[in-house]
Amino acid sequence: MTIAFLDVAITIEYVSTAISLVCLPINILFVYILFVERNRPPYNTPFFRLCIHLSIADILMELFSTFFFKFPSFGVFPSTFYKENWSVVPIAGMQYLGHAQAFGIIFIAVNRFTAVHYPIKHRQQWWTPKVTKTLLLIQWITPLFFMAPLFSTDFKFLFSHNSGSVIFAASDARFHKNYFLAMAMVDGILINLIVLLLYGAIFIRVHTHVVVRKPGELALRLALSAFIIFICYLALGVCSLLSALTPPPDAWVYRTMWFVVNDVLCNSSALVLLALNRPIRKAFTRHLGVFSYQGVSTKNHNSLLQAV
């Protein structure tokens, strides 16, 4: 790789890290607002319960990846920090939080799918508090099974301060290749395919059947939200696949790309919902003290919020 390419890569990662840290308070405040408003319509719906937990996973992933991978790459932490017996913990943590995000994305897509295709059963039968709690337990417990195999081996880390990236390799080369290739296929192919099919079905239904006050605006909001989520996960999956297919010593460039895309993904949920939904923006600014509280009209905004 040329020196110019290295300079561009490290600059992009520095910029994405700085922007993510600036956006972190916004994400935290977003979760706080949804939590405070959780018993007030329309925020007392399963959709916003799922949003809270997805945003928590996003925040934890951003903090974890920054402190355990980026800062050592930037020279903030000494590399000896990763030469102890617990070297598997950073990798396991990333796998756990990444799949917690993935399940959150899938469950939100399923929620939107049932809301559009089966609105009556969606409200009255399927999305009960018990079902929502069960899905949230699945979101946080199932990733444990994805990261469990990692504890059967050790990892070695090599931090490149020139590229701002990190290379890690399991002591068992065969395990390293098989495990990360399998995870890359799950994240990059299976999850993206599921989300794409669900949102594709939503778009078709909204375009041909659903009647709302502003159908064009609703379709645009749905399309933009789904597009950002899908593109982020698609790009993340491509980086994961390329990294898994590349020998560890040569995989640094894909790891750098992965961390940049991950920064975008971790900040997309809160920012997209704030950008595309006026009631959420009003609640956000009200808690900042910009506007006084006048309540949220569920009559005017419920259908729009339910469609995001």
From Swiss-Prot:
It is a multi-pass membrane protein. The chain crosses the membrane at residues 15-35, 46-68, 88-108, 135-155, 184-204, 222-242, 256-276. Disulfide bonds: none annotated. Keywords: Membrane, Transmembrane, Transmembrane helix. It comes from Caenorhabditis elegans. It is found in: Membrane. PANTHER family: G_PROTEIN_RECEP_F1_2 DOMAIN-CONTAINING PROTEIN-RELATED, SERPENTINE RECEPTOR CLASS GAMMA-RELATED. Belongs to the nematode receptor-like protein srv family. GO terms for cellular component: membrane. The gene is srv-1. This is Serpentine receptor class V-1. Its main location: membrane.
